[in-house]
Amino acid sequence: MNMSNMAIDLVGVRKSFGDKVIVNDLSFSVARGECFGLLGPNGAGKSTIARMLLGMISPDRGKITVLDEPVPSRARAARVRVGVVPQFDNLEPEFTVRENLLVFGRYFGMSARTIEAVVPSLLEFARLESKADVRVSLLSGGMKRRLTLARALINDPHLLVMDEPTTGLDPHARHLIWERLRALLARGKTILLTTHFMEEAERLCDRLCVLESGCKIAEGKPDALIDEHIGCNVIEIYGGDLDQLRELIRPYARHIEVSGETLFCYARCPDEISVHLRGRTDLRVLQRPPNLEDVFLRLTGREMEK
């Protein structure tokens, strides 16, 4: 990639806490205008990477560049062009929606007049116009998350760093956040997104890095990763004797994984397997297209831990 077009560049980054390695020799780049995802279970190192990008903690070794600034040495210069959506809301609960935006803008040295001028458009973006004078403590979880996103845009940042932006939200609120993020990408914003939601990564990310125990185990476009590592239909089988089922369908399967009480069968011709399972009332069988959950299971031998 052309380095002048990079919003983020990590080379050989390592971070340990005591004897525990949290991020291990990690390298990746994020192009300006793209949504790049860090996908992995809790403990994979996603939040630690985000904190290093923001200059909140320093790597033990390696090189980090954010918006052409070396981090952490020039983290402050980079941060004025970065918007941050933390994993947990840190809004002022007794302030109104409008007051939260007004106060946050002052952290960037913005004048009261400038902040007042941008607040209406941020309220409209977050679909909170009718809640402008409502205390944050009275908002729903989805509304608080949209306000946190709007607050991160107060300084019109070039880059958004979002740590698990939809954790704890119901499906409707999650989809509304996704719609707002797609609107930002259409405006040319760059987004770094950490998530353990497979659907979120597939819907939003142009490219992603799959992490396991601080190590990169795969990187690429979501559909390319699915095609490379799975490339066929998936049959989930629950119930029965898994060892017997494995032997029964092995001749017709490209690959078989067992996770918990579920057998995952990857096959180019799933009908051949369905014929041999017909009439098995003790089984629950689901046939579906492959997804990123299958990629993670294929690479690690286990499901994504929420």
Swiss-Prot record:
Subcellular location: Cell inner membrane
Name of the protein in question: Nod factor export ATP-binding protein I
InterPro entries membership: AAA+_ATPase, ABC_transporter-like_ATP-bd, ABC_transporter-like_CS, ABC_transporter_ATP-binding, ABC_transptNodI, P-loop_NTPase
Organism domain of life: Bacteria
Membrane topology per record: Peripheral membrane protein
Function: Part of the ABC transporter complex NodIJ involved in the export of the nodulation factors (Nod factors), the bacterial signal molecules that induce symbiosis and subsequent nodulation induction. Nod factors are LCO (lipo-chitin oligosaccharide), a modified beta-1,4-linked N-acetylglucosamine oligosaccharide. This subunit is responsible for energy coupling to the transport system.
Subunit annotation: The complex is composed of two ATP-binding proteins (NodI) and two transmembrane proteins (NodJ).
Source species: Bradyrhizobium diazoefficiens (strain JCM 10833 / BCRC 13528 / IAM 13628 / NBRC 14792 / USDA 110)
Annotated ATP binding sites: G40, P41, N42, G43, A44, G45, K46, S47
EC number: 7.6.2.-
Family statement: Belongs to the ABC transporter superfamily. Lipooligosaccharide exporter (TC 3.A.1.102) family.
Single annotated GO MF: ATP binding
One Gene Ontology cellular component: plasma membrane
